Amino acid sequence: MNIHEYQAKEILRKYGVPTSTGLVVTKTEKINETIDKLNTEVYVVKAQIHAGGRGKAGGVKVVKSKEEAKKVAHDMFGINLVTHQTGPQGQKVNRLYIESGCEILKEYYFSIVFDRSASCITFIASTEGGVDIEEVAEKTPEKIIKFSVDPATGLQDFHMRGIAYELGFKDNQAKQMKEIVKSVYNAFIETDAAQIEINPLIVNSDGNLLALDAKITFDDNGLLRHPNITAMRDHDEEDPLETRAANAGLSYVKMDGNIGCMVNGAGLAMATMDIIKLYGASPANFLDVGGGADRERVKEALKIILSDKAVQGILVNIFGGIMRCDIIAEGIIAAAKDIGIKVPLVVRLAGTNVEKGKEILSNSGLEIIPAHDLADAANKIVEAIR
């Protein structure tokens, strides 16, 4: 789960991380009133969307008067902001964060993530802040530093000293950096975060370190333990089909293709998406119904797939282990009778009760195209939509 910048800063401040502060606006009629509450020489108006690249896309504006700030805020609120992370459709700006500006002497990048390949927690930092870290990694990889923390032993003093040293901090700034490292680590562990990113972490005119922008992504599996964090969820920032799928216990990610996919198991789902591309089409989604899906969940999965107007055909690929093929077949028939399936449908079944499942489908009277293996299924669905 993602949250907005102002929410991320609120969490980080609770853990002792110094951040820039401001006020959030959720209604246009509150813009002028909110800006009047800020007494500052410089105003920073920031669009609040769950995507990076806001600055380059015009979603962050710095102005030097209240009147300018009000005009910029009114112009920005409600626009469709397109960044390199939103895709061409963009994201509507329903919230603004208005801050007091400050002088920036130096910008740094600082984050903490799970490194699955090394089975550890990793700090990533760079003296090149304020830009995409991917760009730094590509052009000047030597400027990226990493420190890995063994979860069994936790954060140690040498980690904090090492990060401060590698970033070039000395004396009081080194002490500040060590405290920030410790605070961010504690926030990461205690909130079940998947990533915390501060970009940029700046040195201001007083020589102090300050988190000027912040992003936190949480592990969905840990949200049950954090109702206060779950309450920060902004459904307007999420695809409504993905929200609907999550409520139904389905793993669904919308994509830009034209072939809807319903599969059991994440690995098989990714293989199915790959082979669709191999045969010349593109997947419209990732959808894993899971191993314990019942008839109603299968039915809801197909409804979600068909709610995407870009879907021109559907490929169902089920390997029945825990999942029974006859349950899948019954769910397909129920969905077809309930909402109608007007696009080509290819079904490949294998595993538990496969013959019973095939029999149910063949006796249904529906126009279902059977496939005997994955390659055959991909070939048939691609040919069917041409």
Swiss-Prot record:
Pathway, per record: Carbohydrate metabolism; tricarboxylic acid cycle; succinate from succinyl-CoA (ligase route): step 1/1
Keyword Metal-binding among UniProt keywords: yes
Named cofactor requirement(s): Mg(2+)
Gene giving rise to this polypeptide: sucC
Reactions that this protein is recorded to catalyse: succinate + ATP + CoA = succinyl-CoA + ADP + phosphate; GTP + succinate + CoA = succinyl-CoA + GDP + phosphate
Amino acids binding substrate: N264, G321, I322, M323
Family: Belongs to the succinate/malate CoA ligase beta subunit family.
Chain segments annotated as coiled-coil in the UniProt record: none
Binding-site positions, Mg(2+): N199, D213
Listed name of the protein: Succinate--CoA ligase [ADP-forming] subunit beta
Record-level GO cellular component terms: cytosol; succinate-CoA ligase complex
Source organism per UniProt: Rickettsia rickettsii (strain Sheila Smith)
Signal peptide as annotated in the record: none
Residues at which ATP binds: K46, G53, R54, G55, E99, C102, E107
Listed PANTHER family: SUCCINATE--COA LIGASE [GDP-FORMING] SUBUNIT BETA, MITOCHONDRIAL, SUCCINYL-COA SYNTHETASE BETA CHAIN
